[in-house]
Amino acid sequence: MFGLQMSVATSDMNGSDPGQPGQRPAAVLIAGPTASGKSALALRLAQARDGVVINTDSMQMYRDLRIITARPTAEEEALAAHRLYGSVDAAVNFSAGAYVEAAAGALAEARAAGRLPIFVGGTGLYFKALTRGLSAVPPVAAEVRDAVRLRLDRDGVLALHAELARHDPAGAARLAPADRSRIARALEVVLATGRPLADWHNQASPPLLPPEGFVAMFLAPEREALYGRIDARFAAMLQAGALEEVAALAARNLDPLLPAMKAHGVPALIRHFRGELSLEEAAAIGAADTRHYAKRQFTWFRHQLPEFRWVTPEQAESGLLGT
């Protein structure tokens, strides 16, 4: 397979030179949709290879939400070193830049100890920042973004594409005229900053991980089996205390636009507490939202990080652990 019998054929995973036999990778990156078994695999690998499991999931950063985000349990964390789990308060709007800074510290700690860094999670933007660097695009003012979206709905995507061609001809030429989201994004950036989006991307910060030597995979279970696991897991979360966890979060009266307040299942359960939904309805919505998110994860990684090798959980287990 693409094994990590502690000699890593990295060329099998990301196209880089495998190096000498017996070479250990600089890091292992395990991405995949929610409920695909990533965390369990990372834990077994950490136990077998003296590794450190480093969180790469934006929602598992929040300490208020262990159960509803399927964060590793305290018992699992005791079995191997885990970093960046539950390290951020729910009141914080934690950015990708803040994640990269925290991940750099965890990576340096693992390297200093001679341990294998194992990045695991489902947040594509975090993996992209680790392997390609963080975009230098400054925040776009809400009024600019809202105006562009309003015109997109009112005038249509072709009108926006024509306007983009006037401001950023090269950028417009790279985009399909019907690509609504990318055209709107490119137009809002050039209107807000006066510079094409490509200029900003060219100023991206250097990646935290070198382009050679790491193993990168995307766990891709069979879809229907995955969706069944998502439904079963959401029901198990409710039995394990997710209701009480979300109730405690709701009692803090935080801004509903904060990332932690939008974790899958949280909005629906808060509506249940307000009497707007029955528990059964809230559970169905939470599970459905999670299934839809898993679908988006498949699509995002396929288009945004094609260098990640897609494997079944069984192939990943065999390749990493030789089982």
From Swiss-Prot:
Keywords linked to the UniProt accession: ATP-binding, Magnesium, Nucleotide-binding, Transferase, tRNA processing
Marked site positions, Interaction with substrate tRNA: T123, R145
Region (Interaction with substrate tRNA): 57-60
Superkingdom assignment: Bacteria
Family, as annotated: Belongs to the IPP transferase family.
Matches recorded under NCBIfam families: miaA
Record's protein name: tRNA dimethylallyltransferase
Organism encoding this protein: Rhodopseudomonas palustris (strain BisB5)
